[in-house]
Curated annotation (Swiss-Prot):
The gene is moaA. [4Fe-4S] cluster 2 binds at C262, C265, C279. One of its GO terms (molecular function) is GTP binding. [4Fe-4S] cluster 1 binds at C29, C33, C36. GO terms for biological process: Mo-molybdopterin cofactor biosynthetic process. The lineage of its organism: Bacteria, Pseudomonadati, Pseudomonadota, Gammaproteobacteria, Vibrionales. This is GTP 3',8-cyclase. It catalyses: GTP + AH2 + S-adenosyl-L-methionine = (8S)-3',8-cyclo-7,8-dihydroguanosine 5'-triphosphate + 5'-deoxyadenosine + L-methionine + A + H(+). Pfam families: Fer4_12, Mob_synth_C, Radical_SAM. Residues 13-239 form the Radical SAM core domain.
């Protein structure tokens, strides 16, 4: 079997092509967000040394790039907690075929380190800011770091990022009333604000029942006020992005409970311990680590991934109350 080419890339039985890999490099996080790790990070018994090494990351990324993947998002946990994070960015960015290197961060280390990340090759950045009210931010994240995170976003613009994406997990009775404040914030800033519906995971049933709210009301409000839906690029994520002539910023909505959400799925996930996850809400991960120990194993790695893609479901089963085996969003990178 020949190596993948762009004409022969990772594709499932529903003819979905996979241009986008979410690569977790740690499941450790220093925040205690109510919707993810409300009790803080608890080690699963494995040592941090069991997270993917830089050479292993290089082999994973090369295999995906050779099969048409052009965008890699480095996730966690909190990826910047890895001391070799700039080296990881450089390794990903220097892989032929990779055009976009993104990360998602809680922003805690951005003010001091975002310049290093950009120099290493980071092209896109997402920051979690679940409230513009510092007290509510503290309540949701468990950390009183609102000012530091906001300074980090300013620093990202200073070092040359043209746009910063800001993730907001939408929660009824906590931050669901903050749309006017968020709109005011992005009026003159090139921020893409992304409202993400709260998702049910294994440990979060009660929180979901109490705080889940659909993004449909926000979408209707945006459309009524002249916001227009933007056309997606091939390696974009699932967000419905809206633009307005009077705003420098943009609004994105991620609504996993929306009909046909999975129809345009274009991403795969690899966990920090080297398991392939076909879906955030899948039932299991597939071991890849035994095939990323030597460069010459690449074809075996590609073959295993391609074989697994033929088992990928057409959709998640969230509507049936089945969120798979994902205990929390930190465990495989959200």
């Amino acid at each position: 079997m020949e190596r993948c080419s762009v004409a022969q890339q990772f594709e499932d039985r529903f003819h979905r092509k996979f241009y986008y890999l979410r690569l977790s490099v740690t499941d450790v996080c220093n925040f205690k967000c109510t919707y993810c790790l409300p009790d803080g990070y608890k080690p699963s018994g494995q040592k941090n040394s069991s997270f993917l090494s830089v050479p292993e990351i290089k082999r994973v990324v090369k295999a995906f790039a050779d099969c048409g993947t052009s965008k890699i998002r480095i996730t966690g946990g909190e990826p910047s907690l890895r001391k070799d994070f700039p080296e990881i960015i450089h390794t990903v960015a220097s892989t032929p075929g990779i055009e976009k290197v993104a990360t998602t961060t809680n922003g805690y280390r951005m003010e001091k380190q975002v310049g290093q990340w950009r120099d290493a090759g980071l092209t896109h950045i997402n920051v979690s800011v679940d409230s513009l009210d510092s007290r509510m931010f503290h309540q949701i994240t468990g950390e009183n770091k609102f000012t530091e995170v906001m300074r980090g976003i300013d620093k990202a613009f200073e070092v040359g990022f043209e746009q910063v994406k800001v993730n907001v997990v939408l929660m009824k009775d906590l931050n669901s009333q903050e749309l006017p404040a968020f709109l005011n914030w992005i009026k003159d800033k090139p921020i893409q604000l992304r409202f993400i519906e709260l998702m049910k995971t294994g440990e979060m049933d009660e929180l979901f029942d109490k705080h889940h709210v659909s993004g449909v009301a926000i979408r209707n409000q945006l459309i009524a006020n002249g916001w227009l839906l933007k056309v997606k690029a091939v390696n974009d994520g699932p967000a419905q992005v809206f633009v307005h002539p009077d705003y420098q910023g943009e609004i994105g909505l991620i609504m996993p409970y929306e009909k046909d959400f999975c129809e345009s799925c274009n991403r795969l996930r690899v966990s920090a311990t080297g398991k392939l996850h076909l879906c955030l809400f899948g039932d299991h991960g597939v071991e890849l680590r035994d095939l990323i120990q030597e460069d010459q194993q690449e074809q075996e790695l590609i073959d295993r991934i391609q074989a697994q893609l033929q088992t990928k479901s057409v959709s998640h089963f969230l509507h049936d109350g089945n969120s798979g085996m994902t205990p929390n969003l930190a465990s495989i990178g959200g």
